[in-house]
Amino acid sequence: LEIADLAQYVVDLTAR
């Protein structure tokens, strides 16, 4: 697990 993966996940959610 990398922080970048979590960041990308959060960005995807907030980008909706």
Swiss-Prot record:
It comes from the Eukaryota. Induction: By infection. Hemolymph. Its main location: secreted. Keywords: Lectin, Secreted. It is found in: Secreted. One of its GO terms (molecular function) is carbohydrate binding. GO terms for cellular component: extracellular region. Binds and precipitates antigens of the parasite Echinostoma paraensei. This is Hemolymph 65 kDa lectin BG05. The gene is BG05.
